[in-house]
Amino acid sequence: MEQEQDTPWTQSTEHINIQKRGNGKQTQKLEHPNLTQLMDHCLRIMSQVDMHKQIVSWKQWLSLKSPTQESLKTRVLKRWKSFNKQEWTS
């Protein structure tokens, strides 16, 4: 079997303990030592997807060629840059 790339998902799902009881039956116990990592990973991915959607919509809006929007473009770009700085520092 090929070794999968180690991700929080595979790490958490691979932690299955098979224990034998006194009567010979096997029980499986699923442990989640990396559940926090998995949740962090999911939140990070969701945040990146959200950020990508925002960037695409802003770029589409900014690509409009109406001359009356030049001042708005400047204002939005300034806000976008400050928003971006806040995102990277948090």
Swiss-Prot record:
InterPro entries: Flu_proapoptotic_PB1-F2
Assembly information from the UniProt record: Oligomer. Interacts with human SLC25A6/ANT3 and VDAC1. Interacts with host MAVS.
Predominant location: host cell
Pfam families recorded: PB1-F2
Something else known: Is not encoded in all strains, and seems to be dispensable for replication.
Sequence segments annotated as region (Mitochondrial targeting sequence): 65-87
Protein name: Protein PB1-F2
Keyword entries, A-Z: Apoptosis, Host cytoplasm, Host membrane, Host mitochondrion, Host mitochondrion inner membrane, Host nucleus, Host-virus interaction, Inhibition of host innate immune response by virus, Inhibition of host MAVS by virus, Inhibition of host RLR pathway by virus, Membrane, Modulation of host cell apoptosis by virus, Viral immunoevasion
Family recorded in the similarity comment: Belongs to the influenza viruses PB1-F2 family.
Ranges of biased composition (kind: Polar residues): 1-16
Entry function: Plays an important role in promoting lung pathology in both primary viral infection and secondary bacterial infection. Promotes alteration of mitochondrial morphology, dissipation of mitochondrial membrane potential, and cell death. Alternatively, inhibits the production of interferon in the infected cell at the level of host mitochondrial antiviral signaling MAVS. Its level of expression differs greatly depending on which cell type is infected, in a manner that is independent of the levels of expression of other viral proteins. Monocytic cells are more affected than epithelial cells.
Nucleus in keyword set: no
Localization, UniProt: Host mitochondrion inner membrane; Host nucleus; Host cytoplasm, Host cytosol
Gene Ontology biological process terms from the UniProt entry: symbiont-mediated perturbation of host apoptosis; symbiont-mediated suppression of host cytoplasmic pattern recognition receptor signaling pathway via inhibition of MAVS activity
Site (High pathogenicity): 66
Source taxon at top rank: Viruses
Stretch list, region Disordered: 1-29
GO cellular component: host cell cytosol; host cell mitochondrial inner membrane; host cell nucleus; membrane
